[in-house]
């Protein structure tokens, strides 16, 4: 619930503030997880009032990776390299634009691979 209002789980939003060509604020609202995350440039990132950070995982064998638009990736020259990487991972998922970026911000995923990223995907 946000501000006392209960939101349907499928509703989700990511909002970013761009000032003078620089991102200064990002907000990710994920009612499906009951979470609200935000980050301010130079001030860190927060999830429901507690400090968060991306995952510290440093070994491929422990890495959880989420992908987006594998069809576009499969049509490019990096497909074979991606295929060689997959067996080395702990897990491979395909959560999709909103969900995998939200999970990445709170450290629940280690890596996101998108073959056609645009600013709307990553701004928040």
Located regions from the model:
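N-terminal subdomain of lithium-sensitive/metallo-dependent phosphomonoesterases centered on the IMPase/IPPase/PAP
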Residues: 1-11, 80, 84
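A generic structural signal for short coil/turn motifs at secondary-structure boundaries
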Residues: 3-4, 73-75, 114
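Short secondary-structure boundary segments
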Residues: 69, 115-117
